[in-house]
Each structure stands twice: as C-alpha cells, then as structure tokens.
Amino acid sequence: MLTKGITLILLLVLVHSSHGDSTPNRKFYIPSIRANWFKANEFCNSLKMRLVAIRSQEDNDAVARYVRTTSKFTDNCSFWIGASDLADEGTFVWVATGEEVTYTNWRENEPNNEGGNEDCIQLAYIPALNYHWSWNDNTCAGQSLYFICESVECDCVQPF
C-alpha cells in the first residue's frame, strides 16, 4: 500500500513539473508602430490587451519564439515589455497587475538606471552587443520601440 501511495505522489509530481507553471492561454501581438513605453502601454490597453509580462524563462523563450516568426525580428531588435520601476526606484512591477517582478533576464550590468531615469524594461536581441533576449532598463519616454502586447484569459472572480 505504501509503495502505491509513493508511486501516486511521484506520478503527480512528474505530471505537474512537465506542465511547468500553470499559465493562462496567451496571445502575443506586435503592432506595426513604434512608440515610447507610455504610448505602447496605452496602445495595448486600447486593444483590450496589455504589455507582455514575462514571469519565467519559459515565458521569455515563448516570447522570443513568437518574435522570431514576425517581420520585426532582426539581428538588432528591441521591444518594450510591461514592467517598470516608476513607482519605486529599483522595484520593478508588472504594471498591468501590480505584481513585483520576480523572474528577470537582465543583461550583464543591468539594470543600471543610467542617467538616473531608466525606469522601463525592454527585451532585446542584439548579438553584437551581447543581448540574447535579455533585458535592459531604458528611459520610458526617450525611445520609440516596437512593443509586445498580450491577451490573457481573465482569472478574475465571476459575478453570481
């Protein structure tokens, strides 16, 4: 009996770990315009989407795979994602949910808040500068970049 119980527990652990983190269905979209981070956030919201939240290496890889399928992919591409430390310097949060960023994929020596005003995160693939789908903090209003929107299933409480 004990052996069957242990086998069942191991089976449950294997099934759970093979699915990784339980994440809702997500759809990514990169508009054909470039914008600063604020306008990118507004644009995604106008589509009933949000700037993408990357909560794990699997998420980072999924976003990279998606970008590679689009016309925006080059050997020198950067995209706004949905986190900033605008509210509290050094504490990055996913702006759509207010959740603190716990997974990161910073490029070496980032975030550096260069010039004292780098508060928004970009995802970059620039091999010549050692960016391999890594993150950089940048000025929110200073650069117009492509950006990645996502739609997610609502995990909110349904009314009675």
From Swiss-Prot:
It comes from Aedes aegypti (Yellowfever mosquito). Interacts with putative receptor-type tyrosine-protein phosphatase mosPTP-1; the interaction probably mediates the recruitment of West Nile virus particles in complex with C-type lectin mosGCTL-1 to the cell surface. Disulfide bonds join C44-C140, C120-C140. This is C-type lectin mosGCTL-1. GO terms for molecular function: carbohydrate binding. CDD domains: CLECT. Putative lectin. PROSITE patterns: C_TYPE_LECTIN_2. Induction: (Microbial infection) Up-regulated in salivary gland following infection with West Nile virus (at protein level). Up-regulated in hemolymph and midgut following infection with West Nile virus. It comes from the Eukaryota. InterPro entries: C-type_lectin-like, C-type_lectin-like/link_sf, C-type_lectin/snaclec_domain, CTDL_fold. Residues 23-140 form the C-type lectin domain. Female salivary gland (at protein level). It is found in: Secreted. Antisera against the protein added to infectious blood meal blocks the interaction between mosGCTL-1 and envelope protein E of West Nile virus and reduces West Nile virus infection after feeding. The lineage of its organism: Eukaryota, Metazoa, Ecdysozoa, Arthropoda, Hexapoda. Keywords: Disulfide bond, Glycoprotein, Host-virus interaction, Lectin, Secreted, Signal. GO terms for cellular component: extracellular region. Disruption phenotype: (Microbial infection) RNAi-mediated knockdown results in reduced West Nile virus infection levels.
